[in-house]
Amino acid sequence: VPVLARWIEAAGIPTVTVTMMPSVAEERLAPRIVGVEFPFGHAFGMPHDRVMQRRSLELALRVLAGATKFSTRVDLDVEWPVPLREAYRRWQPKEPSPIVKKLLESRKSRP
């Protein structure tokens, strides 16, 4: 995503990256970064939680409008309401996808 953000920025369009991996976004030189400690797939918050989603969006817009230097990073001060380990477990499907299943099988067959 940071590479895409820089490409869009080169066209004159400002961007902000909302990410669960802000340190990686910094390493990849994303122009503006909002770090969130949320499970993957939920960058703006819990499904149907409009208050949490709005806080994430408002911070992203403030960073977009107010960042004065390249690679500005601001972390959202909101905790996921469920322990992250439990949230990740819930997020994972009960059965692995065909490609993950094949990968796991190939690992088992290695000496």
Regions found by a protein language model. Name each.
Residues 43-72:
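A charged, well-structured terminal subsegment
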Residues 30, 47-51, 88:
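Surface-exposed beta-strand edges and their flanking turn/coil or helix-capping segments
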Residues 40:
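Catalytic-face loop-and-helix region of soluble metabolic enzyme cores
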